[in-house]
């Protein structure tokens, strides 16, 4: 299977390398399924799948409703992890290698990497990944609908408006000599 798009996302100490390939709709993080790697954390799963949701043209109801019960939550998890669709749509495998940082830093690095890869996928000039050859893209919702790839500027604008292409440059401040931590000093004694 040919790699359609590659991108890198960073957040704090985490670095995520994202590859999008033709396949059968798998979402793999460090050789594990996304749900297993992210420990079934609902926020992390939503954040990782968010760039795909932006591409969805259908206006769906909010996934988190006030009457959210355990069964609704379980069905939402299964909907998040299913990549199913029509016969004429193209399925993509998303393969991520991530290291460094904690779970939330890795989640945000993966989200940035996926967003960048989707932008590259839409602007790719490779004949095997041309818009004419890949007419539809899978949305990771269990509804079974596929989305026609709009032009690159539309995808970029949608992702940029949601803030998924903006890299968060905040990192931990270095420790200074003479201090306990970056800014914490030992207790001051006047006498």
Swiss-Prot record:
UniProt keywords, alphabetically: Chloroplast, Plastid, Ribonucleoprotein, Ribosomal protein
Compositional bias segments (type: Basic residues): 172-191
Any single Pfam family the record assigns to this protein: Ribosomal_S9
PROSITE patterns from the UniProt entry: RIBOSOMAL_S9 (PS00360)
Biological processes per GO annotation: translation
Source species, domain of life: Eukaryota
Subcellular compartments: Plastid, Chloroplast
GO molecular function: RNA binding; structural constituent of ribosome
Family annotation (InterPro entries): Ribosomal_Su5_D2-typ_SF, Ribosomal_uS9, Ribosomal_uS9_CS, Ribsml_uS5_D2-typ_fold_subgr
Entry's Gene Ontology cellular component terms: chloroplast; small ribosomal subunit
Region described as Disordered: spans on this chain: 166-191
Family, similarity comment: Belongs to the universal ribosomal protein uS9 family.
UniProt name for this protein: Small ribosomal subunit protein uS9c
Species for this entry: Chlamydomonas reinhardtii (Chlamydomonas smithii)
């Amino acid at each position: 299977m040919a790699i359609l798009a590659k991108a890198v996302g960073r957040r704090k100490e985490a670095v995520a390398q994202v590859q999008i390939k033709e396949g059968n709709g798998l979402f793999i993080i460090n050789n594990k399924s996304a749900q297993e790697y992210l420990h079934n954390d609902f926020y992390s799963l939503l954040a990782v799948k968010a760039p795909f949701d932006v591409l969805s043209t259908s206006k769906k109801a909010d996934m988190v409703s006030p009457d959210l019960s355990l069964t609704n939550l379980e069905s939402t998890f299964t909907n998040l992890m299913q990549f199913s669709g029509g016969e004429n749509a193209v399925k993509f495998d998303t393969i991520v290698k991530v290291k460094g940082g904690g779970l939330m830093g890795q989640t945000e690095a993966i989200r940035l990497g996926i967003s960048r890869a989707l932008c590259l996928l839409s602007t790719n000039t490779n004949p095997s990944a041309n818009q004419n050859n890949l007419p539809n893209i899978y949305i990771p919702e269990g509804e079974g609908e596929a989305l026609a790839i709009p032009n690159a500027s539309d995808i970029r604008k949608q992702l940029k408006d949601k803030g998924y292409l903006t890299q968060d440059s905040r990192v931990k401040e270095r420790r200074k000599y003479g201090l306990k931590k970056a800014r914490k000093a030992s207790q001051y004694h006047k006498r």
